């Protein structure tokens, strides 16, 4: 009897500890920053698995893969990634897109390392996944050697490399320009004051955008247009046995897909804001459409109850006795446009 009672108390105590741990984990996972980190991690992982898998098919067996297949793999991989995390973090899946949104005031800088870390980890894990799934095919194709260049090179499955007909700085210009086109079109797709994609179709339209960039402009450099797509898999290949040549090949090409997209995304965003965003007519602010500018977009405020709010001429936020002290100044022009996220 005594032993049975002790056993029951021990079991009850273990369950209480388990519930407490689970509750703590659940509490942590519900934190906004953690959810956004996990969203970027998962969406980038999904995009990269489909994208790198399509490249593996093209490199390892022409019967099953093609350049068009690579574009479709990355394009619809982006679509699936947006579906996975679009309403949580915006599903950037691209450090250049995150950087541009931070630089243009759409996302606070404190989120930049969180988003990028999630993207890098997701991309690295996707590279490890493709390596595991295609391991025997890679060895069979290359004769057991992990080569960066040559007719049996397989490092290109995971990262981009400069082709013979391109110079380093032409490649830099190419990557910057393509990423600028990407960011400009992303702003257009999500600008509700212009001709945005229909609700529910943004993910598909963004995926089609990636396909269009690939089939029309991707030949020169393989269109990395994304540090999160190129650098983590490159680091994985270095660890997995391809060696330091993954960094030195192509006049030390590795840094170009990291730096050029950052500059290009900002340039594309600025061009859209100056030439399109600033010239688009904006409807006068209505009381029922009052908005508060938050960290990651524009949030519609609910109507007040019995207290009649007023609109301050200096701020778009509804002003009432309950919230007058928390009013913030009106944002600059570029923040007044609904540009959204990737």
Swiss-Prot record:
Phosphorylation by PKA could prevent the interaction with PLIN1. InterPro entries: Aquaporin-like, MIP, MIP/Aquaporin. The chain crosses the membrane at residues 37-54, 68-85, 112-132, 168-188, 201-217, 254-275. Pfam families: MIP. CDD domains: MIP (cd00333). It is a multi-pass membrane protein. The record marks 74, 223, 229 as: Selectivity filter. Residues 1-36, 86-89, 104-111, 189-200, 276-342 are cytoplasmic. It is found in: Cell membrane; Cytoplasmic vesicle membrane; Lipid droplet. The modification Phosphoserine is found at residue 20. GO terms for biological process: glycerol transmembrane transport; water transport. One of its GO terms (molecular function) is water channel activity. Residues 55-67, 133-167, 218-221, 236-253 are extracellular. It comes from the Eukaryota. Glycerol transport is regulated by pH, with the porin being permeable to glycerol at pH 7.4 but not at pH 5.5. Water permeability, however, is not influenced by pH. Keywords: Cell membrane, Cytoplasmic vesicle, Lipid droplet, Membrane, Phosphoprotein, Repeat, Transmembrane, Transmembrane helix, Transport. Residues 90-103, 222-235 dip into the membrane without crossing it. A motif (NPA 1) lies at residues 94-96. Aquaporins contain two tandem repeats each containing three membrane-spanning domains and a pore-forming loop with the signature motif Asn-Pro/Ala-Ala/Ser (NPA). PANTHER family: AQUAPORIN OR AQUAGLYCEROPORIN RELATED, AQUAPORIN-7. NCBIfam families: MIP (TIGR00861). Belongs to the MIP/aquaporin (TC 1.A.8) family. Homotetramer; each monomer provides an independent glycerol/water pore. Two homotetramers on opposing membranes can dimerize, forming a cell-cell junction. Interacts with PLIN1. This is Aquaporin-7. The lineage of its organism: Eukaryota, Metazoa, Chordata, Craniata, Vertebrata.
């Amino acid at each position: 009897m005594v032993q049975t009672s002790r056993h029951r108390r021990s079991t009850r105590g273990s369950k209480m500890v388990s519930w407490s741990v689970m509750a703590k984990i659940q509490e942590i996972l519900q934190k906004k920053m953690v959810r956004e980190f996990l969203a970027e991690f998962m969406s980038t992982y999904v995009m990269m698995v489909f994208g790198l898998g399509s490249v593996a098919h093209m490199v390892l067996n022409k019967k099953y893969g093609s350049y068009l297949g690579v574009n479709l793999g990355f394009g619809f991989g982006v679509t699936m990634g947006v579906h996975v995390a679009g309403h949580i973090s915006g599903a950037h899946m691209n450090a250049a897109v995150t950087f541009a949104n931070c630089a243009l005031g759409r996302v606070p800088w404190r989120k930049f390392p969180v988003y990028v870390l999630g993207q890098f980890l997701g991309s690295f894990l996707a590279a490890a996944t493709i390596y595991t799934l295609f391991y025997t095919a890679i060895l069979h194709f290359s004769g057991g050697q992990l080569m960066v260049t040559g007719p049996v090179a397989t490092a290109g499955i995971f990262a981009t490399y400069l082709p013979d007909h391109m110079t380093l700085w032409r490649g830099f210009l190419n990557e910057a320009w393509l990423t600028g086109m990407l960011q400009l079109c992303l702003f257009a797709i999500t600008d509700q004051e212009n001709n945005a994609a229909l609700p529910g179709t943004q993910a598909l339209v963004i995926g089609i955008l990636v396909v269009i960039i690939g089939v029309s402009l991707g030949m020169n450099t393989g269109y990395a247009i994304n540090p999160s797509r190129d650098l983590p898999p490159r680091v994985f290949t270095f660890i997995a046995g391809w060696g330091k040549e993954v960094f030195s090949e192509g006049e030390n090409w590795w840094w170009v897909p990291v730096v050029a997209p950052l500059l290009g995304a900002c340039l594309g965003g600025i061009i859209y804001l100056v030439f399109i965003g600033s010239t688009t007519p904006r409807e006068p602010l209505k009381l029922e459409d009052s908005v508060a500018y938050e960290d990651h977009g524009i949030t519609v405020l609910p109507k007040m109850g019995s207290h009649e709010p007023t609109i301050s001429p200096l701020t778009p936020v509804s002003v009432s006795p309950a919230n007058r002290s928390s009013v913030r100044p009106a944002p600059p022009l570029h923040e007044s446009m609904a540009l959204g996220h990737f």
